């Protein structure tokens, strides 16, 4: 008799995706982040759902409803901080997941990669709208500054911004629609994740060598389920340490002041996970140019498969490309740091240098280095 997990219409989908899935025998812990992202998404949806039961999306009561959640709701404080710091864990896993894809050439599977880039954009949009909901000073001014960037679009810019705001400034209508979208998008993300997995399972996973591993596959369960559980335990430990010991470490103290349209905070900045893009935006003195650089800094991931000039897929055996990759990582960390600094010398000039280096590495240096490596190997 056939096992029910292999014959049942629903169970066999789960079986083929998580149990009997043939997986390369040599994938490292860098392949853990996909499952960690799935767990992050589940955690965010669950904590968010319970927070939404007590939150009110009205300018008069939003800030107080957060206070009410933290003080009066049973374990409301842990829900709130698990949700806020869960977003940080989500982005740490996201950036490591994308970095792994860049290093090991996972972008060669273009459909999976492109859906992943769209997912990245959607998660960023969701996180931005979520940051507005507590209606603190940084929520309000962050929303004002970032939505105002759309006014740089020629001809339709101003109308577009007012349409998004639902008025002539960030107000009640803006908060209500941001809450609606923030609630809806994670479910759309879940559907997109399913498509992402569907395309991945069409080709199978890549592996650290970048060489096809069709002759050496092992079942996902129990080998990689147990390996993913180890990664999960480490992530949960880090998240709980943050939530229980320093829940506000990654937040902004200005967000403990209720939103006041008449008083601008001294330094308006987004959450840490957007600082690299914010630094690129600020490094260009022209508004439209800055907005374009901001969008292109992430959209550039779409063209990565076109810039792949190497005869080898992975960077595992390409020391020159490895040096450039780690230079790119260092550059992104520099941009993140500069994004949190005020716009004055030397931070402004260093941000411009880091922005130029970021685009140069991806568009010019990496493809050229790959060609040099091909030549050195006489390919």
Curated annotation (Swiss-Prot):
Q: Where is the signal peptide?
A: none
- Textual note on the cofactor: Binds 2 heme b groups non-covalently.
Q: Name one Pfam family in it.
A: Cytochrome_B
Cofactors named for this entry: heme b
Q: Which GO terms describe its molecular function?
A: metal ion binding; ubiquinol-cytochrome-c reductase activity
Which keywords does the record carry? Answer: Electron transport, Heme, Iron, Membrane, Metal-binding, Mitochondrion, Mitochondrion inner membrane, Respiratory chain, Transmembrane, Transmembrane helix, Transport, Ubiquinone
Q: Which InterPro entries match?
A: Cyt_b/b6_C, Cyt_b/b6_C_sf, Cyt_b/b6_N, Cytb/b6-like_sf, Cytochrome_b, Cytochrome_b_C_euk/bac, Cytochrome_b_N_euk/bac, Di-haem_cyt_TM
Supply the name of the protein: Cytochrome b
Please tell me where heme b b566 binds in this chain: 97, 196
The record's section on PROSITE patterns has: CYTB_CTER, CYTB_NTER
Q: Where in the cell is it found?
A: Mitochondrion inner membrane
Annotated Gene Ontology cellular components are: mitochondrial inner membrane; respiratory chain complex III
Sorted alphabetically, the Gene Ontology BP terms of this entry are: mitochondrial electron transport, ubiquinol to cytochrome c
Binding residues for a ubiquinone, per the UniProt record? 201
Further remarks about this protein from its record: Heme 1 (or BL or b562) is low-potential and absorbs at about 562 nm, and heme 2 (or BH or b566) is high-potential and absorbs at about 566 nm.
Summarizing the function annotation, the protein's role is: Component of the ubiquinol-cytochrome c reductase complex (complex III or cytochrome b-c1 complex) that is part of the mitochondrial respiratory chain. The b-c1 complex mediates electron transfer from ubiquinol to cytochrome c. Contributes to the generation of a proton gradient across the mitochondrial membrane that is then used for ATP synthesis.
Instruction: Tell me its family.
Output: Belongs to the cytochrome b family.
State whether it acts alone or in a complex, and with which partners, per the record.
Answer: The cytochrome bc1 complex contains 11 subunits: 3 respiratory subunits (MT-CYB, CYC1 and UQCRFS1), 2 core proteins (UQCRC1 and UQCRC2) and 6 low-molecular weight proteins (UQCRH/QCR6, UQCRB/QCR7, UQCRQ/QCR8, UQCR10/QCR9, UQCR11/QCR10 and a cleavage product of UQCRFS1). This cytochrome bc1 complex then forms a dimer.
Chain ranges passing through the membrane? 33-53, 77-98, 113-133, 178-198, 226-246, 288-308, 320-340, 347-367
Membrane topology, as annotated: Multi-pass membrane protein
Residues that hold heme b b562 according to the record: 83, 182
């Amino acid at each position: 008799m056939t096992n029910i997990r292999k014959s049942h219409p629903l169970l066999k989908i789960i079986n083929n995706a998580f149990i009997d899935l043939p997986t390369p025998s040599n994938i490292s812990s860098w392949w853990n982040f996909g499952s960690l992202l799935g767990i992050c998404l589940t955690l965010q949806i669950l904590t968010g759902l319970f927070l939404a039961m007590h939150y009110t999306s009205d300018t008069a009561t939003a800030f107080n409803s957060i206070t009410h959640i933290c003080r009066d709701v049973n374990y409301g404080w842990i829900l709130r901080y698990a949700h806020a710091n869960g977003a940080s864990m989500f982005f740490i896993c996201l950036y490591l997941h994308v970095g792994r894809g860049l290093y090991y050439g996972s972008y060669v599977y273009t459909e999976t990669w492109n859906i992943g880039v769209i997912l990245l954009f959607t998660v960023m949009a969701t996180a931005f709208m979520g940051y507005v909901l507590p209606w603190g000073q940084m929520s309000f001014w962050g929303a004002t500054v970032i939505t105002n960037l759309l006014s740089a679009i020629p001809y339709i810019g101003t109308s577009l911004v007012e349409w998004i705001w639902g008025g002539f400034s960030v107000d009640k209508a803006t908060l209500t629609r941001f809450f609606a979208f923030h609630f809806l998008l994670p479910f759309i993300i879940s559907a997109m994740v399913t498509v992402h997995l569907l395309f991945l399972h069409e080709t199978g996973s890549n592996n650290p060598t970048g060489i096809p591993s069709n002759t050496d596959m092992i079942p996902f369960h129990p080998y990689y389920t147990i390996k993913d559980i180890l990664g999960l335990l480490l992530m949960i430990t880090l998240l709980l340490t943050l939530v229980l010991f320093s829940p506000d470490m990654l937040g902004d103290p200005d967000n403990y002041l209720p939103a006041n349209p008449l008083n601008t905070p001294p330094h308006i900045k987004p959450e840490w996970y957007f600082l690299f893009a914010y630094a690129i935006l600020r490094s260009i003195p022209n508004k439209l140019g800055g907005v374009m650089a901001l969008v292109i800094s992430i959209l550039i991931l779409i063209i990565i498969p076109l810039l792949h000039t190497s005869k080898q897929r992975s960077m595992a055996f390409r020391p020159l490309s490895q040096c450039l990759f780690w230079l790119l990582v260092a550059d992104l960390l520099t941009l993140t740091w500069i994004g949190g600094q005020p716009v004055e010398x030397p931070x402004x000039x260093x941000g411009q240098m880091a922005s130029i280096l970021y685009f140069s590495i991806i568009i010019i240096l990496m493809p050229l280095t790959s060609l040099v490596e091909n030549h050195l190997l006489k390919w």
